[in-house]
Amino acid sequence: MSTSKALTDCIKSFLSACDVPLEKSTYLETGLLKGDSVQLALDLNFKKIISIDIDKSAIDNANQRFKNDVLDSRVLLVQGDSQKKIKEIFDQSINIIYLDAHNNDVDEETIAPLENEIKFLLDNVNEKQLIIIDDYIKIKNSYLFENNDKSWKSKLSYKKLKEIISYKGLNIFEIFSSSGTNCHLLLTKNKNFRIEKILFLRNLINRFISIKFYYKKNYFRFMFKKLIIFLL
């Protein structure tokens, strides 16, 4: 889970709208890395935290880092391909689902599980469950990475993602981080959920700041080259 205040505020707001206290809610994530997101979920006071990662060494390290919480059954660490494991673990009691397993150093065939994860979840989630997709700004601009076959960002195009989510009757929000280099896509079947006004205004500001991402990725140079090629 990201440390973005905008995102954590959205999570709290969603749970409140669903009348589910944080301390009684369950958080599921795909993509563990060093376990910082598990720590954040603990700090937010989730009752149960589940993390799936294909990297055994990451799971082993996290088992040591969170050994007391694992022993107390507050944290469950699952090793395996997230697009398969999520089908085994998912149930209606999970409130927040954070998808961040895209990219790993273990198996190139599984670096982009997002498409299968989303397809499964959208067929099974209820109105009290929120799906969060990390790195959405990179997916939205996947054409910047289309020449890199080994990058997860080239495996799921923005067009493909839009097709997957467009017919599901979803309430959709794009939440930008204050860093200007990331944003999250939030999906829910809860039509009554709305972002609070202050958060909405803050998100507009963060959207403007996201120009940093395009600057870092040489977006303007990229578009200029495309224009020159077109004119020639």
Please identify what each model-predicted range represents.
Residues 1-96, 102-232:
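A short alpha-helical cap/connector motif
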